[in-house]
Curated annotation (Swiss-Prot):
PANTHER family: UROCANATE HYDRATASE. It catalyses: 4-imidazolone-5-propanoate = trans-urocanate + H2O. Its cofactor is NAD(+). It comes from the Bacteria. Its main location: cytoplasm. Binds 1 NAD(+) per subunit. Keywords: Cytoplasm, Histidine metabolism, Lyase, NAD. It is found in: Cytoplasm. This is Urocanate hydratase. The active site is at C410. It comes from Brucella canis (strain ATCC 23365 / NCTC 10854 / RM-666).
Length: 557
């Protein structure tokens, strides 16, 4: 029996200004869906896997074909509904409604666990959408680079006087998200040793210039890190190995990194974490044949790694969970103090969220890198005083290789996002850009996620697990006229631990797009300021007042 999720075909997004659909509002999701499965973008495109363990773009290849065919014929007063990667309906709406509404991996809370999801998954009744895999706005490892860079820079400010020169970061995982870490570290001025069990992933990061070197030897890796830090160089190396073995070995040797974190796919104990002592081939085979055995040994292995991270923390080394839920897995395995070290959001990122600042991103549907160069210049023009952002854009231009359609990630917030969107739309209208632009973001944003072990960890008012906020975010983006809106469960940290929403909007150069952009790109980050103001953060309260937000129960207006 053939596997409906495996096909050797190669998918790449169309380029240029010729339409394959009836309008750019349907061409945009078509191209971004296909871009998610570009072999230069996706982790395992032949299996529909984009990143993050089993984060898929469509449920089966037949469903992918149905989505593509439907988008090509969809009218501008119709909306396609996608249920866990399956196109289930087309309904008459109106021109300002989203062209696509997506719900992925959502389960009633009592059943929201990996065991139940995996049962549904085997029957082709569900699909894990991760965050940007099933919402068709993944742009490769660049999508997380700036957030990781901001995290490392803030860690440098807090712990090392704002200077990471001559220091190094230990981490694990070089997948779709973790692959950003070495480059982000180097951009922040540090060296990086990244442990990765799957050599093909390390090779992918080498090919796309996200990591500088590769080795199979821990001794060689440490020697290079030592030489680079002494010389004040910022370079990175991938070590082929198992983080659950390497981290404890470094503790045993008394090696002291300057920062420790991890971005293995620990959120998925079957498909995301190599058990200690296993080969990758053995692991892949047993994922299908004996997933319970894989999960049992993988969880025990995570406990070993987290214990090593605790040892680093107790030695005074800044250590953070980078949002893969590895502490939770270790806690469930009996490591009672697994949460002694913090997550990266409460440690370094939350003040940005309080101002609605997060991972704003855009992609050039033309496929021409020059369109991104022009939009980069426009960002600098509109935000002339943000030198930190200018520095990021300069480094991104120099260091980041585009994957698939050219794209840019750029952390900006409430008050700036809508200005950039309107400017990009004007550039499309006057012909400065060769084709429309799509603007989206990660689901990891200030108002679009409830994830008590990651984005909403340790909220000031204890509202970590309240998931009304991402639901309201999705509803508001739908009402505001985003081109497509998504609502997912389990991204980043796994089943039962998160709910989150995404949006993408197309700049097609029309005046209708101006109105939609102004609404969506104001309202979307404003929900983040609202959420944090409601939790009692002074930064958010002040920003809400400054931006004139009307928050009756919060500001009394």
């Amino acid at each position: 029996m053939s596997n409906p999720r495996h096909n050797e075909r190669e998918v790449r997004s169309p380029r240029g200004d010729e339409l394959n659909a009836k309008s750019w509002l349907t061409e945009a999701p078509l191209r971004m869906l296909m871009n998610n499965l570009d072999p230069d973008v996706a982790e395992r495109p032949h299996e529909l896997v984009v990143y993050g363990g089993i984060g898929r773009a469509a449920r089966t290849w037949d469903d992918f074909d149905r989505i593509v065919a439907t988008l090509k014929t969809l009218n501008d007063d119709e909306t396609l509904l996608v249920q866990s990667g399956k196109p289930v309906g087309v309904f008459r709406t109106h021109k300002d409604a989203p062209r696509v509404l997506i719900a992925n991996s959502n389960l009633v809370p009592h059943w929201a666990n990996w065991d139940h999801f995996n049962e549904l998954d085997k029957k082709d009744l569900a699909m894990y959408g991760q965050m940007t895999a099933g919402s068709w706005i993944y742009i490769g490892a660049q999508g997380i680079v700036q957030g990781t860079y901001e995290t490392f820079v803030e860690a440098g400010r807090q712990h090392y006087g704002g200077n990471l020169k001559g220091r190094w970061i230990l981490t694990g995982g070089l997948g779709g998200m973790g692959g950003a870490q070495p480059l982000a570290a180097v951009m922040a001025g540090a060296c990086c040793l990244a442990v990765e069990c799957d050599e093909t992933r390390a090779d992918f990061r080498l090919r796309t210039r996200y990591v500088d070197e590769k080795t199979h030897s821990l001794d060689e890796a440490l020697a290079k890190i030592d030489a680079w830090t002494k010389a004040g160089e910022a370079k990175s190396i991938a070590l082929i190995g198992n983080a659950a073995e390497i981290f404890p070995e470094l503790v045993k040797r008394g090696v002291k990194p300057d920062i420790v974190t991890d971005q293995t796919s620990a959120h998925d104990p079957v498909h995301g974490y190599l058990p200690l002592g296993w080969t990758v081939a053995e692991w892949r085979a047993k994922q299908e044949n004996d997933p319970k055995a894989v999960e049992k040994v993988a969880r025990a292995s995570m406990k070993v790694q987290v214990q090593a991270m605790l040892d680093f923390w107790n030695a005074g080394i800044p250590t953070v969970d980078y949002g893969n839920n590895i502490r939770q897995m270790a806690l469930e395995e009996g490591l009672e103090n697994a949460f002694a070290f913090p997550g990266f959001v409460p440690a370094y990122i939350r003040p940005l969220f309080c101002r609605g600042i997060g991972p704003f991103r855009w992609a050039a549907l033309s496929g021409d890198p020059e369109d991104i160069a022009k939009t980069d210049a426009k960002v600098k023009e509109l935000l002339p005083d943000n030198k930190h952002l200018h520095n990021w854009l300069d480094m991104a231009k120099e260091r980041i290789a585009f994957q698939g359609l050219p794209a840019r990630i750029c952390w900006v917030g409430l008050g700036d996002r809508h200005r950039l969107g309107l400017a990009f739309n004007e550039m499309v209208r006057n012909g400065e850009l060769k084709a429309p632009i799509v603007i989206g973001r990660d689901h990891l944003d200030s108002g679009s996620v409830a994830s008590p072990n990651r984005e909403t960890e340790a909220m000031k008012d204890g509202s970590d697990a309240v998931s009304d906020w991402p639901l309201l975010n999705a509803l508001l983006n739908t009402a505001s006229g985003a081109t497509w809106v998504s609502l997912h469960h389990g991204g980043g940290v796994g089943m039962g631990f998160s709910q989150h929403a995404g949006m993408v909007i197309c700049c097609d150069g029309t005046e209708d797009a101006d109105r939609r952009l102004e609404r969506v790109l104001w309202n979307d980050p404003a929900t983040g300021v609202m959420r944090h103001a409601d939790a009692g953060y002074d930064i958010a309260l002040d920003w809400a007042r400054k931006q004139g937000l009307r928050l009756p129960a919060i500001l009394g207006n």
